[in-house]
Amino acid sequence: MRSLAWGPDKRATHYHCYNVNGFRFRTKQRDDGKKTQNSGVMVRGEYQNMSYYGLITDIIELRYTKGNSVVLFKCDWYDVAREGIGYKLDRHGITSINRTRKLYTQEPFVLECQAIQVYYVNCIKDLAWSVVIETKPRNLYDMPANKEEPYQEEEVQRFNTHVAEANEEDDERD
């Protein structure tokens, strides 16, 4: 608490790229000219489960005393306040945003731990709209919760049992 009360160091560190929660985020400037998009960001809001979408323009680390630090993403946000104008949901639950509708705010920052990476795919019918695709974190895999017995081990056990029975039959014939 004391570190926060004293405020951050007067110097801040700016990054073009930052890895957190299995995502590799880049600023929009760094993304330009690349084949991949890593500057798209989504933040899940608490009010009415509304999500906010934007592009990272700056990554800033504020350092405090005793080695504490906070990383903030400065973003250009899209205005998704009204359905049909700022965003659309199709019948499959896929979100599209109107990229011409910018949100002008005095609070463009989000904590790095709140950010979820997304990328935007241009809509074929209307170039002002883009479909939002949520990126899966790297090195995290969807593994089944139930532990199933390996099928291969059962086959091996049956095979060994069968071989033993065959050997016993051979002994009885002799």
PLM region spans:
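Conserved, well-ordered core segments of regulatory domains
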Residues: 1-174
